[in-house]
Each structure stands twice: as C-alpha cells, then as structure tokens.
Amino acid sequence: MTNLSDLLPRDPSPDALLDVFTEWVESSGISLYPHQEESLLAVLAGDNVIVTTPTGSGKSLIALGAHFAALAEGRRTWYTAPIKALVNEKFFALCEAFGAERVGMVTGDASVNADAPIVCCTAEILANLALREGRGADAGQVVMDEFHFLAEPERGWAWQVPLVELPQAQFVIMSATLGDVTALADDLTRRTGRETAVIGG
C-alpha cells in the first residue's frame, strides 16, 4: 500500500485531505462508515472529537485520518494508550502507514525517534510532558485511545492532565464505554476554544 506521507497534498484544505485519505482507504478495499467520515470532517474543521462507537467500529481509522490531517497541516500529533503493548502495536501500524521516519514511540521502557511529528506513547508520558511544558509543549493534536481509563482511581490523572494543560491541542478522544459525554464536550470546548463534536454518543 502507498505510504500516506507520499500523498500529502500541496494544498492541505479539508476537502483535499478528505479526498486523498478516502482514496487511500478505498485502495485497500475499505469504505468509510458514516461515523468515520463524520469524525474526519470534524477533525478537518479543526474541532475536537469524542468518538463513543462500539469496539470494532473502526476508531483506529479515525485516528489514522486525524494523524494524517495534523501531519499535512504541520502540527505535531500524539497518540496515547493505556498499555505499552497497545502503544507498540500502534507504533508499528503508523510506521507502515506513514513511514518509520515520521513516527516515534516513547514509553517508560523505550524511546524510538522521539522527535518525530507523530509520537505514540503511554498516557503518563504525555501527561508528564503536559505538566512540564503546558502551553509551550509541541502538541498540536492529541489522540487519546481507551479514554474510559479516566475513571481509574490510580491512573485517571494521566487522561485528565493533558485536557487541562494543553489548551492549544486539538483532541480526538476515543472509547467504546464512555457513557454521557456532554459535560466532557462542554469542558473541552471551554478549555480549547474549539467546538467539540460527539460521534456515536
């Protein structure tokens, strides 16, 4: 499959980016579901997005499209997950999609290409960066997977801190089990100044 980095349009308009990404997806025999296209349109409009669709509904493709948009717009984008195994899995998937030179990984155990424009990391890594650098952090976009970990008594802070300390970022929040996200969406909009689209909730 063609590397997405090779398809970055000269004009990174929302329409151009959606067309290129859709064609790339369809070249592998996949069609976007309506909720995936709706999510990507919101990302391309500059909105935060909260995706609460069931497991197996293609949230990974939404994340991929979000990273593509950020890369095209010259924004550094972060993918966070709760466990190192999932971070590793996503790192290799994104390397395949964008090329290894564009993707980095940082966990408590390893650091690979940490200055890359797309970085996969555990939630705690990004939270600590947010605490250290805040508004000065190079974080134009944050994709947070398995966001229901926010409710974990011992680890939930790592999902909360970026929302508070990185108001410059566009957030793409994903989980199959979030429940009512009205308050979260309102809070995100207030903190970031971006509209927040809720998909599937």
Label the model's feature ranges:
Residues M1-S13:
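Interdomain "pre-motor" coupling segment immediately N-terminal to P-loop NTPase/helicase cores
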Residues R10, L18-V25, G29-G201:
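Conserved P-loop/Walker A NTP-binding site and adjacent catalytic elements of P-loop NTPases
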